[in-house]
């Protein structure tokens, strides 16, 4: 009679999230008819990506042995991860007959697939995305051998559900009996659906779409663009929200999206590869599956078409410029050979040159330029269009000479900076002396570049953090990373920039860099809010320092030049625009 009071729980799609080789969490997903779960071909551990869609075994950093071990450990249970997302487990309290059925029929088969996949990956011929496609094919593509496992399991759980309905206790009250019948009929329906080969074919097809699109995204985007994509979207997605930071902080996992199979397959048939790539990119940026319908697909297709037209116009424009340059070169050669008509040729060349300048100014907006801290204005701008910031003295300090900086830090209150060598100070000045970024931060376009990285309390003050993806070129080297801005509000409510630096990082570590918890732990302890602050719009560099800020369509640059020879670029910081969300 113990069974009478048992709590039955039937999970139609994902019952278990596998992290490494252990069951860590049970959860349920609400799916509409026709929806499917797609897995993205990126392996995460905690906040960070440890394998991209294009990552092969030979690409893994051998110096970071723990990273290689994490990937291989995750692959050891990859088939269980896929099964639990796409098919699910039947979990019944106080009765393990469905679990026994799974263990007897599917467990060994799934383990074999994971083991074979791990061996294939370690040979180095397949990327992770290609491996994921292969595993889906092996698990769900029916043939005489493989199809039998799923069909046998479906038949077995159907039979067990029937037996349980027939064996239901006679003294069970009517309401409880109806509940049991609903649950058990649901299990029967699930088992019977395993015979639907079209369902499995569709599942394979959808995963191929995701894997192919992610491969193209990884191959087409530059490193800094990929960093922007991952920082902006995928690491804030569904699984992280469902399980929480603590649950996945040291676990391997895949992110997913629930989407209408009909909409996605229809989009591929109607629009093709470029639109599918953009759709998947929007998913990675955080677009929810329920928001992706036919109307949204058409909107994305329109954006892609317009982008292609712009590229074609740009190519056509460049071709015209090349032809014009060739004509100029020919005119000059003819002018040298002829002794007559020289002045006319020069006059024609001058007219041609003048026309070119007019066309260029019409096509390209004139960038705002700041030289040596004094802005050279190219157009009127109301004060209301700019945000007001103050700069804390600890940030202003970095504009001084290394010797002066060291002297001030050594007698200051921040222990982390005391006793640093002059060489260390010089290195740190390169990544901290970037106050020109405030020109962008104050502008109306700031939100197109900076993303909100959260707030936290520390040292008695509430602090806000913003980050932007960037690249720093110095000493013949190019480093990708993020521009970090930390602020608190003074007594008047004005944001004070107390932290400003370029932090070199990679795609694999971008999660920790933007994670609020990690930032709070490493943030400076106490900031003296009474120290000298300066209005950002009044800030100028010391005499003799030369830099320019140039704002373009997709980037903002700060260029430091040699004061003695301004043709020589000493350092360049590029801040990139955030990915476009449609």
UniProtKB/Swiss-Prot annotation:
It comes from the Eukaryota. Transmembrane segments: none annotated. Residues 330-339 have a biased composition (Basic residues). Residues 326-386 are annotated as: Disordered. Residues 344-354 have a biased composition (Basic and acidic residues). Belongs to the UPF0329 family. This is UPF0329 protein ECU07_0070. It comes from Encephalitozoon cuniculi (strain GB-M1).
């Amino acid at each position: 009679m113990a069974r009478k009071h048992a709590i039955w729980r039937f999970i139609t799609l994902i019952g278990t999230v596998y992290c490494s080789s252990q069951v860590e969490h049970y959860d349920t997903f609400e799916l509409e008819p026709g929806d499917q779960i797609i897995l993205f071909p990126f392996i995460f551990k905690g906040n960070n990506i440890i394998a991209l869609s294009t990552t092969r075994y030979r690409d893994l950093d051998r110096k970071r042995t723990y990273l290689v071990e994490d990937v291989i450990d995750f692959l050891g249970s990859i088939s269980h991860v896929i099964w639990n997302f796409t098919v699910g487990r039947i979990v019944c309290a106080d009765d393990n007959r469905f679990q026994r059925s799974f263990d007897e029929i599917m467990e060994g088969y799934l383990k074999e697939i994971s083991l074979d996949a791990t061996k294939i990956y370690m040979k180095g011929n397949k990327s992770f995305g290609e491996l994921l496609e292969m595993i889906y094919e092996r698990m769900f593509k029916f043939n005489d051998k493989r199809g039998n496992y799923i069909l046998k399991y479906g038949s077995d759980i159907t039979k067990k559900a029937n037996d349980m309905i027939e064996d239901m206790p006679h003294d069970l009250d009517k309401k409880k009996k109806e509940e049991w019948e609903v649950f058990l009929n649901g299990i029967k329906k699930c088992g019977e659906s395993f015979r639907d080969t079209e369902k499995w074919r569709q599942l394979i097809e959808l995963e191929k779409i995701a894997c192919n699109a992610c491969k193209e995204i990884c191959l087409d985007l530059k490193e800094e663009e990929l960093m922007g994509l991952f920082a902006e979207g995928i690491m804030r997605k569904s699984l992280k929200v469902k399980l929480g930071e603590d649950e996945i902080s040291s676990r391997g996992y895949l992110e997913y999206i629930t989407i209408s199979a009909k909409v996605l397959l229809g989009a591929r048939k109607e629009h093709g590869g470029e639109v599918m790539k953009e759709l998947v990119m929007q998913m990675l940026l955080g677009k929810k599956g329920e928001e992706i319908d036919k109307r949204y697909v058409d909107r994305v297709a329109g954006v892609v078409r317009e982008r292609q037209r712009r590229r074609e116009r740009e190519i056509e424009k460049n071709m015209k410029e090349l032809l014009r340059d060739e004509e100029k070169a020919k005119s000059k050669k003819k002018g040298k050979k002829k002794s007559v008509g020289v002045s006319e040729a020069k006059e024609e060349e001058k007219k041609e040159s003048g026309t070119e300048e007019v066309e260029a100014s019409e096509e390209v907006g004139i960038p705002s330029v700041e030289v040596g801290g004094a802005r050279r204005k190219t157009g009127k701008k109301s004060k209301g269009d700019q945000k007001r910031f103050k700069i804390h003295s600890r940030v202003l300090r970095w504009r001084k000479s290394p010797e002066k900086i060291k002297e001030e830090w050594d007698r200051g209150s921040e222990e982390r900076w005391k006793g640093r060598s002059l060489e260390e100070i010089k290195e740190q000045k390169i990544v901290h002396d970037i106050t020109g970024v405030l020109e962008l931060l104050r502008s109306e376009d700031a939100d197109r570049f900076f993303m909100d990285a959260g707030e936290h309390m520390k040292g008695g003050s509430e602090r806000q953090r913003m980050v932007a993806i960037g690249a720093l070129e110095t000493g013949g080297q190019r480093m990708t990373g993020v521009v970090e801005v930390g602020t608190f509000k003074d007594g008047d409510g004005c944001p004070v920039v107390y932290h400003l630096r370029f932090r070199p990082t990679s795609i694999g570590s971008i999660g920790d860099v933007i994670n609020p918890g990690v930032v709070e732990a490493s943030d400076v302890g106490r900031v003296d809010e009474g120290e000298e602050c300066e209005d950002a719009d009044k800030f100028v560099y010391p005499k003799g320092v030369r830099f320019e800020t140039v704002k373009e369509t997709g980037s903002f640059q700060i260029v430091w030049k040699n004061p003695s020879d301004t043709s020589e670029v000493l350092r360049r910081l590029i801040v990139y625009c955030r990915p476009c969300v449609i």
